[in-house]
Design a protein with these regions (language model features):
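N-terminal leader/targeting and pre-domain segments
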Residues: 20-44
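Structural micro-motif
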Residues: 95-106
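Non-catalytic, surface beta->alpha helical segment in thiol-disulfide oxidoreductase systems
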Residues: 106-129
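Structural microenvironment flanking redox-active thiols in thiol-disulfide oxidoreductases
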Residues: 84-93
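Sec-dependent N-terminal signal peptides
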Residues: 4-12
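Local sequence-structure signature of Cys/Sec-based thiol-disulfide redox active-site neighborhoods
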Residues: 35-76
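C-terminal segment of classical bacterial N-terminal signal peptides
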Residues: 14-17
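Structural recognition of the beta-strand scaffold that forms the well-ordered cores
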Residues: 52-55, 78-80, 104-106, 111
Length: 129
């Protein structure tokens, strides 16, 4: 019984290990949720307003923030990758801006740390539906 149980447990944990390794090796956030019409409009609006999201691919809060937008809207955002080993990393810019945590939003020259709901982001940027 023990001989069967140990390989079985190893096999059952393998997909999670492969999945985690795969995401880690991506070096970028992988957003899977679908966008709404409103989230796409908001993303396009914040680009025009010069809003920047400072992020790190390995940051769970950054992924949570990005999932609120969905994958289509996320592609519209001005996202600066701060992780040194991230794809298109701009670590020096993040250091120059004194980014202390992720995600950090730059709105009207002000840095705001943390996950913002789409409603909060709309209010802070003046977005109207």
């Amino acid at each position: 019984m023990k001989r069967l149980l140990i390989p079985l447990l190893a096999f059952l944990t393998l997909p999670n290990a492969v999945h985690s390794s795969h995401l880690y090796n991506q070096r970028e956030l992988i957003v899977t949720s679908e966008s709404t019409k409103e989230s796409i409009e908001l993303a396009k609006y914040v680009i025009v307003k010069g809003v920047v999201k400072y992020s790190a691919y390995w940051c769970p809060n950054c992924l949570n923030q990005s999932e609120l937008f969905g994958k289509q809207a996320y592609k519209e955002l001005n996202v600066v990758e701060c992780a040194r080993d991230g794809i298109n990393s701009k670590t020096q810019l993040c250091m120059d801006k004194n980014i202390k945590g992720f995600p950090t939003w730059e709105i009207n020259g002000k840095l705001i740390l943390g996950v913002l709901s789409l409603k909060e982001l709309s209010k802070l940027t003046g977005f109207k539906k």
